[in-house]
Amino acid sequence: MTDTAPTDITTATDITTATGAATGTGRGPAATARGHAALAKTQVLIEALPWLSRFQGATIVIKYGGNAMTEPALRAAFAADIVFLRYSGLRVVVVHGGGPQITAHLARLGVESTFVGGLRVTTPETMDVVRMVLLGQVNRDVVGLVNDHGPFAVGLSGEDANLFTARRRPAIVDGQEVDVGLVGDIVEVRAETVDALLDSGKVPVVASVARGIDGGVYNVNADTAAAELAVALGATKLVVLTDVEGLYADWPTSDEVLSELSITELEQLLPTLAAGMIPKMEACRRAVRGGVPQAHVLDGRVPHAVLLEIFTDDGIGTLITPDRDTANRVAPAAPTAYSGGRP
């Protein structure tokens, strides 16, 4: 037998139909069905709730690069993610490089890019182009995309307020040091300016150049810069966007992605990694060893990858944690009124 509502009981459809007729809105049964279909979207919001509570007020440093920086749809999605995080009460810092853009601009000038030991040979003339592209093009583009949603992003470089100080770094080839010009290692971070911007509700967007201890200007690795800044800020998370799904268990034999590693497990794997992943995983290692509780490597080719990692139970990519916290991802419990949801 099919159950039906008693004739003396007003159903939800009756109320909706009557209300629509009375108000002229036309919200009849079809509108009700659409409303019920939209209920599925609430599950996404409910899943995000404990994570929103946990990370309210947390500082997150995101290294932005790869396809997420070059494909228009991914660039727009990334900017929307940043604004969503800001509205959700997180303190967000973006650190970027711009290797492909620098190479393209040098090519237009008829200058061939040369790399030694994975480092760009950076002459004074090349450094002029690096600064011009990173500060005048890439940084302004990122700031503009975020500010399409409101006056949030502020662009700066590692030179500003002596944010990053670097010393000259040689490349190592066959165990020998090779001079690669104005390439530096960060030796000091003064994060007061970034902290002040975060306190005022802004999103600092930082280009990866640094002032040298000798007064010069140096090209620094953006992955390293993001890690050093995360440590200096006492960040809760470092997120590194890449063009792969995460850290593979046994590439190229297998495409299985390691969802989580302890810092010790990562250090054991580092010597075996492909050259392109070493700077990114070394940045994660540096951040976690420096006190950042979590470091993530995410596939920047996935739209809204940052939101998927932070606000869903499963997450994506590879998570690096301290040795004391190697449990699988589990959604945090809802905060008590006393805790206020602080991480």
Swiss-Prot record:
Enzyme nomenclature, EC number: 2.7.2.8
GO cellular component terms listed in the entry, alphabetical order: cytoplasm
Single GO molecular function: acetylglutamate kinase activity
Listed pathway(s): Amino-acid biosynthesis; L-arginine biosynthesis; N(2)-acetyl-L-ornithine from L-glutamate: step 2/4
Reaction(s) the record says it catalyses: N-acetyl-L-glutamate + ATP = N-acetyl-L-glutamyl 5-phosphate + ADP
Listed GO biological process terms: arginine biosynthetic process via ornithine; L-arginine biosynthetic process
Binding locations of substrate: 98-99, 120, 219
Main location (coarse class): cytoplasm
Gene3D superfamilies: Acetylglutamate kinase-like
Record has Transferase as a keyword: yes
Keywords: Amino-acid biosynthesis, Arginine biosynthesis, ATP-binding, Cytoplasm, Kinase, Nucleotide-binding, Transferase
Class of this enzyme: transferase
Positions of the record's site feature: Transition state stabilizer: 63, 280
CDD domains: AAK_NAGK-C (cd04250)
Alphabetized SUPFAM superfamilies for the sequence: Carbamate kinase-like
Cell compartment(s), UniProt: Cytoplasm
Function: Catalyzes the ATP-dependent phosphorylation of N-acetyl-L-glutamate.
Family statement drawn from the similarity comment of this UniProt entry: Belongs to the acetylglutamate kinase family. ArgB subfamily.
Name of this chain's protein: Acetylglutamate kinase
Organism: Frankia alni (strain DSM 45986 / CECT 9034 / ACN14a)
Source species taxonomy: Bacteria, Bacillati, Actinomycetota, Actinomycetes, Frankiales
